[in-house]
Amino acid sequence: MKEISMEKVEAARQAMLETVKSKSLTHEQKVATMANHADSLLSVLDLPEGLLEVLRCEPEKQCICDLFEGNAPMRPRYIIPDYEKFFREGSAFLQVEPPKDLYEAINALQIFYKHVPSVTNYPVYVGQLDTLLNPFVQDMDEELAFKMIKLFCIQMDRTILDSFAHANIGPRATKAGRLLLRAMAETKDAVPNLTLKYDEELTEDDFAIEAIRCAMASAKPSFCNHRMYSKDFSGNYVIASCYNGLAYGGGAYTLVRLILSNIAKRAKDRKDFLEKELPYIMDLCVRYMDERIRFIVEESGFFENNFLAKEGFIHRDRFSAMFGLVGLAEAVNILLEKEGKDDCRFGHSKEATELGVEIMDCISAFNEAHKNPYCEVSNGHFLLHAQVGISTDVEISPGTRIPIGEEPENLADQMEVLSHFHHYFPSGTGDLFPIDRTIHQNPEYVLDIMKGAFQKNLRYLSFYSNDSDVIRITGYLVKKSEMDKLKQGKSVLQDTVALGLGAAENGKILERKVR
């Protein structure tokens, strides 16, 4: 372990004291924050030379961001347990038997969730809930089953204090799936996040319509292109956290992102960006990711000691890493401005789209050339990820999205631009569409949009009503009423509310074009 300066120690001590005295943090939030402060005092990774200049620097010069994973990673960032195995076999460590009815199934899940770690300290994947619960509701009184599932949803919202917790349903309709949609439409809570795996050949229209009505009420589910993800992951995938596609029974060691807009600022012109600045930053980024992965696998002891691995709920060789990026739109605009083409804007110009594709091809080729020995599930490569942004991002659009306020007037034109980029990102990308309240009377309109988009190989879509209290910030959900409370200095239950408030203030997320 490397030495650190007393200046850093004193800064950490001061931050700890401020955390203790905070009037807006709950006890649980203080405990988690104190752990992060303690982690900041460690220095155990062998960092590539030059990394800190673009990682730990002023925001306008930062080109690489590790999304607060800490200096000494003690577990993978995202963990995707095999819940079906848990239901089949139970767990010796947790002293839980395989469930025999809905009471036991829900109780077992509630116990299990408490013991699934992640970067947020809460589970980022809570299971394919429709198929998990469906066997137990077949012979039950439907209203009793509904009440139990509704209470289960409420319990998750009040105890999993982070809206990156994500459930999946679909693609086929089930009795449990319909009960879950009914419950979430009624509760209108931020947790859990929810995705419907949609396939036009497998998902009945009436089930999709039911899901759209739920989304208009509660901003969930989102909809993923099941056919596309199944191809990328040989059928065995989940959607976790925001909209992260990951292998079942595995997960992601780490997620580190490129800030493309700031990399573009370093470049003299397009050629300098593509041939010098971008490759240089990407090389630093992947070597940093390699070192984080090495430490988790070889030194942390997680896969040797955690019951999830010891009992076979996760497998080390089903983990990969997420090579993220933000700010493609701004990078394109900056590079075109350097060429005197101020009128060529991302989302409105064929040349801008073509430059965006050229940049993505460069990143994709670099990733394909890089190998990591511990990413067997993805053939030794990292998974590209269009990262959703963080609360402190200013004039940096998530992933490959068109900047808020610059969306094309015609939705079809926006979809056309997006269709050039979604295919690059097996570990997740997505776009958000606030929908006018009148669409509540015509959910078929949204279904038609979705069918057309998925036929164009878009990967992931989210819709929510423009008058809903629950809104989708980037990939996660927050209540506007909770953000208002936090803004007034009051404590709130979920830590993602603070992220949502920051995104509202810095990222203009409340100003998206309503469709």
Cite the ranges covered by each PLM segment.
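Conserved catalytic cores of very large enzyme subunits
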Residues: K2-D317, K338, C344-S349, A365-R515
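Conserved phosphate/anionic-ligand binding catalytic regions in large, soluble enzymes, centered on
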Residues: V124, H315-A331
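Non-catalytic, well-ordered alpha-helical scaffold segments
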Residues: G127, P279, L325-V326, V357
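Terminal accessory/anchoring regions of large secretory-pathway or extracellular enzymes
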Residues: A329, S349-T353
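Well-ordered alpha-helical scaffold segments within catalytic/enzyme domains
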Residues: E330-K338
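Short amphipathic alpha-helical coiled-coil/interface segments
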Residues: L355-N367
